[in-house]
Amino acid sequence: MSKKRLYEIAKELGKESKEIVQRAKELGLDVKSHSSSVEAATADKIVASFASAKKAVAGTSEAKAKPSTEPIKTEATPSKPAKDKTEQATNKPSPSPASSPKPVEEASAKAPASKQEQAQGTAAPKVTRPQSRNFKAEREARAKEQAERRKQQGQQRPQGNRNDRNDRRNNQNDRNDRNSQNRNDRRNRQEQGNQHRNQGQSQYNQQRQSFNQGPKIDFKARAAALKAEQNAEYARSSEERFKQAKANKEALREQNKRKEQAKLEDLFVEVESPKPTAKAPATPAPTAQDPAVDTRRKKQARPDKERDNFDHEEDGPRKQQKNRSSQNQVRNQKNSNWNNNKKTKKGKNNRNNNATPKPVTERKFHELPTEFEYTDGMTVAEIAKRIKREPAEIVKKLFMMGVMATQNQSLDGDTIELLMVDYGIEAKKKVEVDAADIERFFVEEGYINEDALEERPPVVTIMGHVDHGKTTLLDTLRNSRVATGEAGGITQHIGAYQIVEGGKKITFLDTPGHAAFTSMRARGASVTDITILVVAADDGVMPQTIEAINHSKAANVPIIVAINKIDKPGANPERVIGELAEHGVMSTAWGGDSEFVEISAKFNQNIDELLETVLLVAEIQELKADPTVRAIGTVIEARLDKGKGAVATLLVQQGTLNVQDPIVVGNTFGRVRAMTNDLGRRVKVAGPSTPVSITGLNETPMAGDHFAVYEDEKAARAAGEERAKRALLKQRQATHRVSLENLFDTLKAGEVKSVNVIIKADVQGSVEALAASLQKIEVEGVKVTIVHSAVGAINESDVTLAEASNAVIIGFNVRPTPQARQQAESDSVEIRLHSIIYKVIEEVEDAMKGMLDPEYQEKIIGEALIRETFKVSKVGTIGGFMVISGKVTRDSKVRVIRDGVVIYDGQLASLKHFKDDVKEVTNGREGGLMIEGYNDIQVDDTIEAYIMEEIKK
């Protein structure tokens, strides 16, 4: 079924849409606006409701109104007057009631009254309009009527008559409503510029004049008169406004004068009275002479809208420029008066006008502190905040003390102390703690809690000469085969191990005995509690033995002497005891303080006695530690692992080290990612005297560095970065600069050749040992320059650096990566790989000796005597000679000796035997020779032949 919208129903019934919407709501329909749609049946109900209402109205008006079929006289019925802007509508004759079913109202509206009748005020009789109209029937009737009219006009219309065409155009729409009038007006305005149209319009006006009974109205003159009247009225109102504004201004001026006079009088009263009382200024009462000023802004009387349509004409208000300027002045003055005198409102600008004044709060008095802890560089504002005083007060005190300062100026310590003395406060300087200083944890007395101290395992370092059995002894103690795993059978880095004896733990550190590992032995002695000095019974005291004794004495560590290899036939323990006594190590049997134990590490002889001695000495020392504090300790060894990164072997000395602890190790920092003990097992906690290997550091630390655990990772990072920055600055400051004092040494050093070396090793201790050993090599005229040293495999960056610095890469217990090996082959960079340290030293020493310039000595190989000379043009002088001793060779150098004096020293140009070129002429034979660059050869000259031979070193 089809639907209809409410506005379509309204159009059919000739009703307004809102009436249809209202009627639909009365019928109980859910509609919202005239655009709502309803079913066809519902639409019929709405139409039927209006039809029933129409019948009810028609029944009531039948007795009062005449029947609609009776004709109505419309000659005396004038239409409504039209507006001035629109033209007069065409007066058309009314059709008869029989010929047209149109309503009476439409027929009467088609005969508009003339202007004369409107002026005379002729009233038209009232016509009763029906409540509803059948628009469809009306449209059909109009269509028929228009068709008949067109037919009649077409028969009577002459050819080429423009006036008839205009009449037909005007008569096409007989509805004299507002839309047709506006359309005709627009069309007429568009054709005003056409002269032919103007003539036709004049004819049309003349024809229209015949229909209108009365004189023609001049609309232009009427509009001009209306505009003149409006301008005059506007001028009169402007003059009145100007006079009113002037009067208001004078009244305001007088009022301000009276207010100023009242203020002056109050001021004089306050000066004369000793204790003035607060009074509100009296406002003078308005008198009869002072008229009340109406400061309210009046609404401007805007001229009629009709005069705006004639602003383009010459007689408009634009002509009155002088009056307009005066009007603007009056308007501005009035606006200013209105703004000055307007009533106060509750708003942002006047929110406190009527508010009661708050009582003045007294400042709280703060007592001065008894003590003040200060730092150098504190500002006046900071001091004022600390002692709860105003900065201006402190600035004043400083000014009285002779110190000119502002609140943002820094003060030194002496000035702050003087200021506190003036206030009666005891000043103390704050001791600033360097967060990057790890050493403070080892020396601070308050760091360790004396009540929480517990017994800890002793740390024992095994020291001695190379190949005296240190690692074999430790191997026996651990029941393992550590010695067989070392390259060359010697220990080349510190090993940290822990064993259990009698229910008690003992931590052992195995140090290298080779001369190159002096720094390692010193590092081991600094962290140990007891030193076991291993001496072979057949070798006795050796250089590294003496060095170990000195390290132990420097660290004030007790020494236990283990005389090893007593199972050998040539063992002599008594000789060893005597030799040690010469170096200050006395046995307890001889009145000393060192314990001596004769052992055989190979056959496990007297090992238990040695361990009992260690525990006894440790018990005497009363070794204790606090496991409750954050862990501190020392780096035993460090290396760079390909899969794990930086790996450091730490010895915990105080506290407890846990996994995930933020830690600072030397100049590096990080978080403990994982911990493993000496057996390779992962642990989460490491107590005092426990050696562990950790990962998680950002770089590889140096062996011997201290470490400390911080409260959080942020503090650890800040401390580590600060330590790295300080180390770099210290390294830069250590660079020597050329001065007048060392200029000669610098020039002399430039003549010395150098061997550039890049060292890569498996652990940090080996790097240090190699660097120290290579720098100790003494070869006259050659020195070793270590370009770079690090831990880890040889990589591409090492090869690139070696190529740029012309260096040799030495790898100790490491191997180059495949990419580094290929790059080294293409760049011709030499890589030497070793696993035994003394072989590295020998090889570098040979290379240094090979870099020296060879030394040569002169060797005379023969003499010849000139017997004849021949001068050949373009060749030179040829000397015929005879060898009197030795031989003369082609590549030998010669000297020309005349009367025992060397005349010339040079090289042979040619050597011949008769006409043949020969390489040498032996003793007793003759030949000819020429000397390069020399032709003054004479008879009886002696030719001495010699060569330069290299001297072997």
Curated annotation (Swiss-Prot):
Locations of Low complexity compositional bias? Answer: 191-214, 274-288, 332-341
Domain tr-type G intervals: 455-622
| Residues that, per the record, bind GTP | 464-471, 510-514, 564-567
Annotated stretches, region: G3: 510-513
What residue spans carry the region label Disordered? 53-368
**Covalent S-S links between cysteines:** none
Note down the stretches annotated as region G2. Answer: 489-493
**Basic and acidic residues bias located where?**
135-151, 162-190, 236-266, 301-318
Q: Give positions of region: G4.
A: 564-567
Q: Which family does it belong to?
A: Belongs to the TRAFAC class translation factor GTPase superfamily. Classic translation factor GTPase family. IF-2 subfamily.
This chain belongs to the protein called: Translation initiation factor IF-2
